[in-house]
């Protein structure tokens, strides 16, 4: 049993327990040699499965500002330890529980960031990384207002010669149909579906797979457009979805441009209304003054 103050691998001093899950615990630790802080995952020996080693193998290959970075791996008699970036912030699921949903401009900006992350993962060579578990609880909003994707526990390397996945993986409510059927094959279009489910919840306060009702009716052109984008991401058949994260990004950028235009239009209308009020006030004042002088 590890305690606060214990030294791991001779240099990582445990400061506090960050969290505990089914496969192990995560501690905030200070590197006593460098003085910086890291998140250290401890996985007991009997829990260190092939899936765990696969996650480590994937994370070791990645280097992106919006992804955790693995800097050290070691073992002792108590199990396996993974030292990675300490992400300070709040996950989007916690924010949703407080707020209910988010304004469309915020969702568009966040979704553009998520598209960039997926574009990076899908561009890894020789084997692209399929994340497979995008959902609000796996997305951290840092203190610097940047999104970071966490928990690569069910991610996989996409190998073109494989015809099906070796195990079912995904979170109901966010998972694409191919993630939940035996013999299904996940690829980058699976991540597009997960992205669509996440966008849906950020906009409407619930994931699309939990309640019936579809999209909230709207006459707003921006909302109609983004609902169309989300709807295409959520197509049951992979060939009906956007095929690349870049395709989704381009569509979202067009929505962002619409928001800019609409914002400029609203500001112009507001200024004209102010000018009109001022002019009418001046006219009213002039009429009043003229009336006084005519008496």
Regions found by a protein language model. Give the residues of each.
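Activation-segment/catalytic-loop signature of the eukaryotic protein kinase fold
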Residues: 73
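AlphaC helix of the eukaryotic protein kinase fold
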Residues: 44-61
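Protein kinase catalytic-loop region centered on the HRD/HxD motif
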Residues: 116-129
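Conserved short submotifs of the Hanks-type protein kinase catalytic core
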Residues: 77-91, 95
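C-terminal lobe helix-coil module of Hanks-type protein kinase domains
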Residues: 173-257
């Amino acid at each position: 049993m590890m305690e606060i103050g214990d030294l791991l691998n001779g240099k990582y001093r445990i400061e506090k327990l960050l969290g505990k899950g089914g496969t192990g615990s995560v501690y905030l630790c200070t590197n006593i040699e460098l003085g910086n802080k890291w998140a250290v995952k401890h996985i007991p020996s009997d829990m260190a499965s092939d899936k765990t080693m696969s996650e480590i193998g994937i994370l070791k290959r990645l280097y992106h500002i919006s992804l955790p970075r693995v800097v050290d791996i070691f073992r002792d008699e108590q199990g396996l330890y993974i030292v990675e970036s300490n992400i300070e912030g709040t996950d989007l699921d916690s924010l949703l529980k407080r707020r209910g949903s988010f304004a469309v401009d915020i969702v568009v900006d966040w979704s553009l960031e998520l598209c960039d992350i997926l574009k990076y993962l899908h561009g890894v060579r020789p084997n692209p990384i399929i994340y497979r578990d995008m959902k609000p609880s796996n997305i951290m909003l840092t203190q610097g207002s940047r999104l970071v994707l966490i928990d690569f526990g069910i991610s996989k390397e996409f190998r073109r010669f494989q015809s099906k996945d070796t195990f079912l993986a995904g979170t109901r409510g966010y998972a694409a149909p191919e993630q939940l059927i035996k013999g299904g094959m996940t690829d980058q279009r699976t991540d597009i579906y997960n992205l669509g489910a996440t966008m849906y919840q950020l906009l409407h306060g619930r994931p699309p797979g939990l309640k019936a009702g579809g999209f909230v009716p709207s006459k707003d052109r921006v909302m109609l457009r983004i609902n169309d984008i989300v709807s295409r991401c959520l197509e049951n058949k992979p060939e009906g979805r956007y095929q690349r994260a870049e395709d989704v990004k381009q569509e979202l950028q067009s929505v962002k441009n619409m928001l800019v235009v609409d914002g400029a239009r609203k500001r112009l209308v507001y200024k004209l209304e102010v000018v009109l009020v001022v002019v009418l006030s001046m006219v009213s004042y002039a009429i009043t003054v003229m009336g006084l002088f005519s008496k």
